[in-house]
């Protein structure tokens, strides 16, 4: 099961479409997942229903926050510019940080986070979100592994033999290489995930959709600003490489 080049290049768009479809399912199924679970566990007339709802929202917050934490940890070693790049980078094998415990920590974290964000959707939306995103992540994993195997050869085969694919080992399975994590850029690259966790947590306390919407909007705008900054840096780097090649070409033509 392997994603196409189109799926990988436009994975952010596909994830956004799946989220839109999942939350749009409220038009068909009007019952929120948390509400449904509260009714199922304590009943619609129970005096403890608000406490149960807050508990489930707190659990959703923990799922998303844990996912954001693991994604930040992984991005600190992989680099946010690589995480959010449309191109597949397979020239270097990363074997530090969470990559010593699981081969695909970012996808593992995304699946865990989806369990939390899915609780904010309807029952049908939860099924759509968790099912479709998990399938997409598994397809993306398949494509990445195929290219890593092609590029890295025996080194990746050994890495794959020792390190679990998606379910992390509690203990490191390979020695680290001593790479230094870049925490600042990693955190900025996961601002939206952290914002989503904060928004759900705030809603669990206040039960006010406006508070959640404001936090999500601010986090999303900050995330877009960071992506624009990464794109600007990539443009500058391309210009530097282009100018360097032009200088070398002129020097080669000079008698």
Predicted regions and their residues:
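Membrane-anchoring alpha-helices and their flanking helix-loop junctions
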Residues: 1-96, 112-255
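Conserved SAM-binding loop
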Residues: 100-112
